[in-house]
Amino acid sequence: MTLDVFTKVVSQADSRGEFLSNEQLDALANVVKEGNKRLDVVNRITSNASAIVTNAARALFEEQPQLIAPGGNAYTNRRMAACLRDMEIILRYVTYAILAGDASVLDDRCLNGLRETYQALGTPGSSVAVGVQKMKDAAVGIANDPNGITKGDCSQLISEVASYFDRAAAAVG
């Protein structure tokens, strides 16, 4: 995303044989500033990924104990591990989308076909969607913490972060 913006602006100026204008420089400075916010958010989510996944799974299983009861979709250590792995993969691809500012990496490499896979395995997509929403709540809370991050209004970025989780929940639910 950032490289494309810089390349486009420089190419346009070069094709006209001009220096970059003050407006163009200001716009590029804003891209860098916004990029720092994205990096802060991704770093926070990544640093807390294990807790986000574990706590979301714990809350899901408290709400839906049938999942971990004998015969449940997360019963046995192997199935539980698969559940946690899938939640971690979804979270990882959400961070890629946040960094890129684009959901296509999330869609193309993670979500496309995931619902069908879960249906074929008999995994309740609605339960996975609840788990994703719980990860969203935790990740947004962590990303919204104003301590130690780039200052400025992050409401649009936080809304974007939430939208990637909503997209993932809708894809599996």
UniProtKB/Swiss-Prot annotation:
(2R,3E)-phycocyanobilin 2 binds at C154. One of its GO terms (cellular component) is phycobilisome. It is a peripheral membrane protein. InterPro entries: Globin-like_sf, Phycobilisome_asu/bsu, Phycobilisome_asu/bsu_sf, Phycocyanin_b. The keyword Thylakoid applies. Keywords: Antenna complex, Bile pigment, Chromophore, Electron transport, Membrane, Methylation, Photosynthesis, Phycobilisome, Thylakoid, Transport. One of its GO terms (biological process) is photosynthesis. Contains two covalently linked bilin chromophores. Light-harvesting photosynthetic bile pigment-protein from the phycobiliprotein complex (phycobilisome, PBS). Phycocyanin is the major phycobiliprotein in the PBS rod. Belongs to the phycobiliprotein family. This is C-phycocyanin beta subunit. The lineage of its organism: Bacteria, Bacillati, Cyanobacteriota, Cyanophyceae, Nostocales.
